[in-house]
Amino acid sequence: MSRAGTWMKMLGVGIVICVGGPAFVQYIRPTDEELFKRYNPDLQKRSLEEGDRRAREFDEYVTRLKQWSKSDKSIWYAAQEQQEQKRVEAEVQRNQARDDAKVQREEMRKELLGEK
């Protein structure tokens, strides 16, 4: 066989692989509805209940990623800073709740002692 024939065969095989492979994968891949129908009824119910929550969480995550990417810093540093800020806020809230509980206990103690 001539060189041109070999090149044509290789070109044909390459096209079949490059076009046919992804087309075959797309053909055998099940759709979301088909996968959902394969779930057992409990999983279908839970999936329907949690779908909105998961969509909201994903949207919030994408929004945070967009905010972090606007920063000059690396996304990882921006995420770490936000996590540290949340930790500090949670600690402040815990301290505030502890102080409020302490004040309430003192008021209750004063009421009890004042009535006796």
UniProtKB/Swiss-Prot annotation:
GO biological process, one term: mitochondrial respiratory chain complex III assembly
InterPro entries: Cbp4 (IPR012420)
Spans traversing the lipid bilayer: 7-29
Places the protein is found: Mitochondrion inner membrane
GO CC term (a single one): mitochondrial inner membrane
Chain segments carrying region Disordered: 88-116
Segments forming a coiled coil: 78-112
Membrane topology category: Single-pass membrane protein
Domain of life: Eukaryota
Pfam families: CBP4
Alphabetically ordered keywords of this record: Chaperone, Coiled coil, Membrane, Mitochondrion, Mitochondrion inner membrane, Transmembrane, Transmembrane helix
Location (main, coarse): mitochondrion
Function according to Swiss-Prot or TrEMBL: Essential for the assembly of ubiquinol-cytochrome c reductase. It has a direct effect on the correct occurrence of the Rieske protein, core 4, core 5 and apocytochrome b.
Recorded family membership: Belongs to the CBP4 family.
Protein name: Assembly factor cbp4
Organism: Aspergillus niger (strain ATCC MYA-4892 / CBS 513.88 / FGSC A1513)
Gene name for this UniProt entry: cbp4
